[in-house]
């Protein structure tokens, strides 16, 4: 039918990839009494945090469930409130910049295969890349990095109570994002040949340098939409990955616009006309004015307006 079976399969696979994140969250519940799932008002003292009852925190990620049917244009509308800050949808990579102190209310559009799950700037999200249903500590880890300042400690343990902690410290300054990695604990419980795929989710055209124990080393650059490098993990040695974005914030905004316009179902001539108008915009304000005044369908305009959320 509509592909819901395949979508469910993908989310079940993603849940398995989340095990490092979920296991660490369970450890925090045990050690610090911090729940995995929390209402927004646990973290944000705002009237909106109480009014938007469907939204919740999932290990620090903001989740906005889809509670209404999709419309004929293929999108569901989700009314959301976001606190002040910068957020990235972990599935669609859409970015949202909230500058007002009291946060901002708005509407997000999503197709059947996705729901809004937003990582705040500074988030570090560990995922397993191992295949199969093994519950062993993963040999291959993917570390998703969302530009900003933050800290995350990955927790792993063994069958006899051994523990291992990997500190992941993220800083952003002077146009570069730096991820520091250092592990401590019983190294016998982690795989000897562990590799880390590090994905800088907000850098689309960038360069990276990797330092191991203060010495620069070669790293394997992988060709994904965003800047991605692979490094071999070494216990007891600090790893630093320094990433630089070669594009400005407005250039990244234009990149998102191009992606939305490519996917939009519009009359080809109208679509081409406004696409050419948009790419000539000199700044974000002008781009927003052009979108509002365009002849595009309301669903396309609403999707484009998410760029300025």
Short names for language-model regions:
Residues 1-207, 213-214:
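Catalytic core of carbohydrate-active enzymes
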Residues 133-309:
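Beta-rich accessory regions
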């Amino acid at each position: 039918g509509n592909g819901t079976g395949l979508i469910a399969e993908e989310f079940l696979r993603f849940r398995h990839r989340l095990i490092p994140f979920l296991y660490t969250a369970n450890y925090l519940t045990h050690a610090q009494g911090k729940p995995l799932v929390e209402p927004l008002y646990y973290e944000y003292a705002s009237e909106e945090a109480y009014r938007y009852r469907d939204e919740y925190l999932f290990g620090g990620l903001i989740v906005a469930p889809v509670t209404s049917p999709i419309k004929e244009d293929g999108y569901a509308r989700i009314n959301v409130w976001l606190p002040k800050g910068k957020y990235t949808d972990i599935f669609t990579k859409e970015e949202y910049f909230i500058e007002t102190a009291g946060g901002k209310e708005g509407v997000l559009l999503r197709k059947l295969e996705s729901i809004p799950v937003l990582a705040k700037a500074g988030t570090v999200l560990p995922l397993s890349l191992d295949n199969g249903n093994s519950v062993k500590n993963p040999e291959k880890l993917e570390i998703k990095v969302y530009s900003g300042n933050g800290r995350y400690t990955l927790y792993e343990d063994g069958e006899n109570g051994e523990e291992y902690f990997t500190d992941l410290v993220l800083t952003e300054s002077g146009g570069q994002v730096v991820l520091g990695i250092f592990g401590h604990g019983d190294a016998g419980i982690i795989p000897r040949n562990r590799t880390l795929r590090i994905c800088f989710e907000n850098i689309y055209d960038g360069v990276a340098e990797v330092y191991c124990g203060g010495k620069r080393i070669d790293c394997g650059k992988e060709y994904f939409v965003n800047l991605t490098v692979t490094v071999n993990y070494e216990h007891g040695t600090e790893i630093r990955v320094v990433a630089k974005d070669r594009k400005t914030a407005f250039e990244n905004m234009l990149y998102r616009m191009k992606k939305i316009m490519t996917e939009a179902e519009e009359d080809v001539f109208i679509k081409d006309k406004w696409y050419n108008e948009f790419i000539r915009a000199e700044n974000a304000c002008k781009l927003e004015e052009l979108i509002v005044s365009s002849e595009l369908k309301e669903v396309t305009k609403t999707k484009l307006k998410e760029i300025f959320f």
